[in-house]
C-alpha cells in the first residue's frame, strides 16, 4: 500500500488506485486534526508529531499499537517501515519507545543519511 501511495497508485508497473484516490487518502481532511483519511501526517509543531522533523509535509503513515510504524514519502520516493514490539514483556509500559521517541528518531537518521 505504501509503495502504491508513493508511486501514485501503481505497484510494479500495474495500476491499482487512481492518482485521485491516492490524493484523496493522503491530503489533510480536517482543520482540527493533522490526519488524512486513514493515515497520520506530520504535526505543524514538529516536536509533537509522530514522524521525523525532516519529513516533508507530504508524508503519510501509521503508527501501530505494538510499536510498528510505516510512512510513505512521495516527495522523496521513500517508504519507511520500523518494526518493533513495545508490548513485550509489559503491554502498557511505554517508557522506552514512546518517551524516547524512537520511531521518529530512527526516521530522522534515515533523512540525515540521505543528505550525505
Task: List where the protein language model places each region.
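Catalytic loop of the DD-peptidase/beta-lactamase superfamily, centered on the K-T-G motif
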Residues: 2-116
Amino acid at each position: 500500500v505504501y509503495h502504491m501511495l508513493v508511486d501514485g497508485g501503481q505497484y510494479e508497473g500495474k495500476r491499482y488506485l487512481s492518482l485521485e484516490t491516492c490524493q484523496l487518502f493522503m491530503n489533510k481532511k480536517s482543520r482540527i486534526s493533522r490526519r488524512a483519511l486513514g493515515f497520520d501526517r506530520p504535526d505543524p509543531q514538529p516536536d509533537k508529531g509522530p514522524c521525523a522533523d525532516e519529513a516533508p509535509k507530504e508524508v503519510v503513515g501509521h503508527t501501530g499499537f505494538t510499536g510498528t510504524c510505516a510512512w510513505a514519502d512521495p516527495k522523496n520516493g521513500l517508504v519507511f517501515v520500523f518494526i518493533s514490539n513495545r508490548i513485550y514483556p509489559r503491554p502498557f509500559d511505554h517508557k522506552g519507545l514512546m518517551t524516547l521517541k524512537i520511531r521518529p528518531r530512527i526516521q530522522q537518521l534515515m533523512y540525515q543519511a540521505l543528505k550525505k
